[in-house]
């Protein structure tokens, strides 16, 4: 984002280099301190998470051995009951295991040292390896037996299995899920209907796991792509909306620390991620009387639940009597004469005030508003007529809000009219045109997530559509960009993903079609029909139809609605005829080629 200067909104550079430093060069205090007393109880689960996320291919036995070894090494270097907690201790252990290092291709990273070794090992964490199978909860009877025999081993196995499949999920989130699952097992093993109890409660945990992992990976990807500056800006917005009663001094302090914690978590520094998160939550609860009246119930919870509760608590309400007039916010000061540091602090204070007076606006919309606001200030300060130049300022800022609200209304109207399946088909056509290089499975998964956004957000009251939609779309687009980072899709998607974080959604929305895409030669293999179409039901049949739709659009991206309707009608006719035939396979063999020929003639392919 151009409006954030190289010095960054909240300078975190010196603080990130040393935990012992409690103020940055702006004199912003920190809620954190340099004390890191780590006990054996802390280390066991954290070591499992750290080793498993860095080496997800490792077996549970290999991870347990590294955990045991690193704990012994920590104890040896400690004389006061506080164990050494530097990330390097864990990385040393990974590389010390030569057999493991060679077995899993770590020797290249382990031949390096310090920051280089750390970054090399981090680069391997981009995705969970294909060799790791999807996670499956054990059968209820098996779970109850194992949990009763050795609760600690059972829960450590859960932490291991979750960590290896979610390499970017923050340690506190994994531990919170583990605590929830522990309670589920205890409750369901005593229930009359164990199967039903486990099925219901596990579904909730699986949903939280999926959403939490996606969010954490998205944040880490944004930091990796855009650096800490965007993170600091979004942190100011989120904190100001959540803690609307807090003054700017408190928000600066918390933004500094929360942004730093995100970076620790994304660097794989699970111990500091956990401990510093606890310190910030403790501070927030100790100051709740001046920060927010909405977190009182959260602050009564155990630490393992506290963070999740505060993060998911409702945003605050706009303080009574507080208003913001953007055209008067600068006053009689000359923005052009501000130093870079003064501009940073001024824009940070604008973000704070605008966010706390608009607690329900999407974060991305506020980022766009701030970008436009600074651009107008820069231009008007140069004109010499600041008051007159700002006449249309509020109109220009309001356009961002109106665009987001209009899109959310349009999307929810479509969802309410079409329903899940037809809306997904509409998205499939659009995204196959934008990204025809993606596989059918990727496109179906991607558009399925879009339908999930609509089904979640459009159930809310209309004033919440925009905030919900923009927030979920940010994560959805973020994961498209993570896919693009791993293997570039096309130049249009790359441009949207890389040029501006705040404008990603706008860019993807306006990118209608990859004009560089050349359809492949027509292949009848993609349009062969068999009797399994008659046997397929529900989701399986829908997927088969959607794969056909994707192949049609890939073959002819400019496919019109009329052409699509005609092909769909012909295909439905084929299904009806052949599924009633005495020999379905013979019917498809005879009639299928006729449909393909008719379709090719109609589409000119």
Curated annotation (Swiss-Prot):
Glycosylated; contains two glycans. Sulfated. Plasma. Residues 1-18 form the signal peptide. One of its GO terms (cellular component) is extracellular space. The keyword Metal-binding applies. Glycans are attached at residues 247, 498. Disulfide bonds join 95-110, 109-120, 144-189, 188-197, 220-266, 265-273, 285-299, 298-309, 380-389, 412-458, 457-468, 481-497, 496-507, 534-579, 578-587. SUPFAM superfamilies: Serum albumin-like. Its main location: secreted. It holds the Pfam family Serum_albumin. Residues 19-207, 208-398, 399-597 form the Albumin domain. It is found in: Secreted. InterPro entries: ALB/AFP/VDB (IPR000264), Serum_albumin-like (IPR020858), Serum_albumin/AFP/Afamin (IPR021177), Serum_albumin_CS (IPR020857), Serum_albumin_N (IPR014760). The keyword Repeat applies. GO terms for biological process: apoptotic process; homeostasis of number of cells; immune response; ovulation from ovarian follicle; progesterone metabolic process; sexual reproduction. GO terms for molecular function: metal ion binding. PROSITE patterns: ALBUMIN_1 (PS00212), ALBUMIN_2 (PS51438). The modification Phosphoserine is found at residues 107, 111, 113, 340, 440. PANTHER family: ALPHA-FETOPROTEIN (PTHR11385:SF7), SERUM ALBUMIN-RELATED (PTHR11385). Binds estrogens, fatty acids and metals. Belongs to the ALB/AFP/VDB family. This is Alpha-fetoprotein. It comes from Mus musculus (Mouse). The gene is Afp.
């Amino acid at each position: 984002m151009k409006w954030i200067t190289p010095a960054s909104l909240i300078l975190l550079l010196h603080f990130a280099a040393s935990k012992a430093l409690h103020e940055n060069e702006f004199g912003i205090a920190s809620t954190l301190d340099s004390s890191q007393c780590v006990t054996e109880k802390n280390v066991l689960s954290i070591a499992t998470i750290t080793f498993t996320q860095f080496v997800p291919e490792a077996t549970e036995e290999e991870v347990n051995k590294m955990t045991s070894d690193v704990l012994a090494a920590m104890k040896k270097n400690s004389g006061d009951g506080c164990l050494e907690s530097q990330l390097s201790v864990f990385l040393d252990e990974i590389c010390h295991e030569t057999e493991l290092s060679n077995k899993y291709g770590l020797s290249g990273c382990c031949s390096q040292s310090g920051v280089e070794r750390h970054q090399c090992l981090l680069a391997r964490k981009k995705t969970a390896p294909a060799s790791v199978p999807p996670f499956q909860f054990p059968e209820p009877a098996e779970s109850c037996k194992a949990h009763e025999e050795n609760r600690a081993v059972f829960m450590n196995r859960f932490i291991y299995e979750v960590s290896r499949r979610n390499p970017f999920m923050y340690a506190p989130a994994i531990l919170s899920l583990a605590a929830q699952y522990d309670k589920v097992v205890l409750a369901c093993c005593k229930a009359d209907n164990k199967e039903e109890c486990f099925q219901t409660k596990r579904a909730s945990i699986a949903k939280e796991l999926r959403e939490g992992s996606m969010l954490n990976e998205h944040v880490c990807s944004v930091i990796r792509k855009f650096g800490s500056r965007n993170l600091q800006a979004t942190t100011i917005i989120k904190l100001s909306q959540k803690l609307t009663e807090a003054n700017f001094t408190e928000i600066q302090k918390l933004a500094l620390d929360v942004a730093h914690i995100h970076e620790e978590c994304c660097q794989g520094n699970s111990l500091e991620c956990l401990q510093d998160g606890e310190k910030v939550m403790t501070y927030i609860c100790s100051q709740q009387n001046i920060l927010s009246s909405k977190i009182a119930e959260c602050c009564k919870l155990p630490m393992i639940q506290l963070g999740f509760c505060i993060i998911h608590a409702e945003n605050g309400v706009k303080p009574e009597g507080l208003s913001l007039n953007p055209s008067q916010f600068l006053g009689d000061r000359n923005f052009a004469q501000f130093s870079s540091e003064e501009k940073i602090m001024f824009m940070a204070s604008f973000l704070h005030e605008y966010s706390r007076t608009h607690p329900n606006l999407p974060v991305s919309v506020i980022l766009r508003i701030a970008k436009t606001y600074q651009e107008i200030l820069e231009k008007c300060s140069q004109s010499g007529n600041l008051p007159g130049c700002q006449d249309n300022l509020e109109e220009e800022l309001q356009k961002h809000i109106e665009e987001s609200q209009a899109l959310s209304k349009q999307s929810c109207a479509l969802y309410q009219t079409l329903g899940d399946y037809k809306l997904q088909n509409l998205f499939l056509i659009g995204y196959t045109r934008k990204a025809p290089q993606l596989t059918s499975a990727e496109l179906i998964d991607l558009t399925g997530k879009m339908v999930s956004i609509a089904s979640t957000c459009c159930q809310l009251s209309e004033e919440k559509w925009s905030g919900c939609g923009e927030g979920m779309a940010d994560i959805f687009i973020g994961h498209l960009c993570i896919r693009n980072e791993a293997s570039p899709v096309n130049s249009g998607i790359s441009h949207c993903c890389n040029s501006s974080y705040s404008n990603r959604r706008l860019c993807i929305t306006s990118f209608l079609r990859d004009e560089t895409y050349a359809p492949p030669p027509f292949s009848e293999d993609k349009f062969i029909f068999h009797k399994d179409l008659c046997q397929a039901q529900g989701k399986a049949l829908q997927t088969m139809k959607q794969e056909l739709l994707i192949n049609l659009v890939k073959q002819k991206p400019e496919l019109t609605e009329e052409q699509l309707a005609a092909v769909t009608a012909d295909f439905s006719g084929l299904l009806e005829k052949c599924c009633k035939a005495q020999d379905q396979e013979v019917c498809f063999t005879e009639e299928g080629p006729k449909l393909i020929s008719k379709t090719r003639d109609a589409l000119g392919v």
